[in-house]
Amino acid sequence: MTVFSAIPPISCWFTGRTPASWDKTMDMQTSFLDRLFEEGLLIETGVDGLYGRSGQFEDVIAAFERLIDRTGGADGAEAIRFPPGINRAYFEKSGYMKSFPQLAGTVHSFCGCELDHVSLLKSMDEGGDWTKDQKATDIVLTPAACYPLYPTIAKRGALPAGGGLYDIQSYCFRHEPSKDPARQQLFRMREYVCMGTESDVTEFRQTWMDRGVEMMKAVGLDVTIDIANDPFFGRAGKMLANNQRDQNLKFELLIPVTSATNPTACMSFNYHQDAFGQKWGLNLENGDVAHTACVGFGLERIALALFAHHGLDVKKWPAKVVETLWG
């Protein structure tokens, strides 16, 4: 699982007072977002964190994905693409609601009769809550691109000799509306997921940490890599976050986008130990429980980092960056 958490969500117990640096960061985020709207790179929808993208914005993402392909293509990963929705039964089994209930998004639909429909329309006409009788469907919005992968691979039986390596990409949803253009509610995540022995997956993670730094260097972005934790919910979540950091299970590649003091996580490197192997029944060829790790690219965030550092006019980007992305 990859959960990007460069800018921690503000907990409900905070007071209304915020440090001056926070106010400055929020101003920078809003200013950058306004410029992106003015240039037409992002398209406002009236909902914070839900944006259309221009052809130019999409072209930058496509170019960076080709760089990902060139970097990892020789590894022989199996490419799988899932829709941005996951089987609700898989979602429930994943335990996501135990750790991140504040981020989840479920899909509800009208399932009533004609009289219920009349009541719904009346409620809409009167400005009432027409959603109260909507029922949950069997689909949940995908919270992380790799979530549908684990049950899918488990159904195949034991992993082949040498384990498994998978290339996945999906739109993901996180309910955290924000004026920060780098914290979107619907965004794309590209991942490589490794399943194998502990040494296999930790080596995989280190390889991609090294590759990530080189990739960002090639496109003119200054980065740092730091230990991190996922935004676990509640008081118990603080203990989980501390354990995650103490065991060095998560690292993030950070790039300043809207703030130099609070850089944005644009890549994430996660070691799950055998947690997903145990949960989903992922086994090695010899019957041992598989360990898993993943590397995630936040595609919109990387594109935003490029625009923030090199300018909103791609024609004026440094020649070396253009050559790296478009050849």
Curated annotation (Swiss-Prot):
<feature type="binding site">
    <location>
        <position position="294"/>
    </location>
    <ligand>
        <name>Zn(2+)</name>
    </ligand>
</feature>
<comment type="subunit">
    <text>Homodimer.</text>
</comment>
<feature type="binding site">
    <location>
        <begin position="265"/>
        <end position="268"/>
    </location>
    <ligand>
        <name>ATP</name>
    </ligand>
</feature>
<dbReference type="GO" id="GO:0005524">
    <property type="term" value="F:ATP binding"/>
</dbReference>
<feature type="binding site">
    <location>
        <position position="174"/>
    </location>
    <ligand>
        <name>ATP</name>
    </ligand>
</feature>
<keyword id="KW-0436">Ligase</keyword>
<feature type="binding site">
    <location>
        <begin position="183"/>
        <end position="184"/>
    </location>
    <ligand>
        <name>ATP</name>
    </ligand>
</feature>
<dbReference type="InterPro" id="IPR045864">
    <property type="entry name" value="aa-tRNA-synth_II/BPL/LPL"/>
</dbReference>
<keyword id="KW-0479">Metal-binding</keyword>
<feature type="binding site">
    <location>
        <position position="301"/>
    </location>
    <ligand>
        <name>ATP</name>
    </ligand>
</feature>
<feature type="binding site">
    <location>
        <position position="176"/>
    </location>
    <ligand>
        <name>ATP</name>
    </ligand>
</feature>
<comment type="function">
    <text>Catalyzes the ATP-dependent activation of L-alanine, and to a lesser extent of L-glycine and L-serine, and their transfer to the phosphopantetheine prosthetic group covalently attached to the vicinal carrier protein Atu2571 of yet unknown function. May participate in nonribosomal peptide synthesis or related processes. L-proline and L-glutamate are very poor substrates whereas D-amino acids are not substrates for ATP-dependent activation. Does not display tRNA aminoacylation activity.</text>
</comment>
<keyword id="KW-0862">Zinc</keyword>
<protein>
    <recommendedName>
        <fullName>Amino acid--[acyl-carrier-protein] ligase</fullName>
        <ecNumber>6.2.1.n2</ecNumber>
    </recommendedName>
</protein>
<keyword id="KW-0547">Nucleotide-binding</keyword>
<dbReference type="GO" id="GO:0046872">
    <property type="term" value="F:metal ion binding"/>
</dbReference>
<feature type="binding site">
    <location>
        <position position="191"/>
    </location>
    <ligand>
        <name>Zn(2+)</name>
    </ligand>
</feature>
<keyword id="KW-0067">ATP-binding</keyword>
<feature type="binding site">
    <location>
        <position position="191"/>
    </location>
    <ligand>
        <name>an L-alpha-amino acid</name>
    </ligand>
</feature>
<feature type="binding site">
    <location>
        <position position="250"/>
    </location>
    <ligand>
        <name>ATP</name>
    </ligand>
</feature>
<comment type="similarity">
    <text>Belongs to the class-II aminoacyl-tRNA synthetase family. Amino acid--[acyl-carrier-protein] ligase subfamily.</text>
</comment>
<dbReference type="GO" id="GO:0016874">
    <property type="term" value="F:ligase activity"/>
</dbReference>
<feature type="binding site">
    <location>
        <position position="146"/>
    </location>
    <ligand>
        <name>Zn(2+)</name>
    </ligand>
</feature>
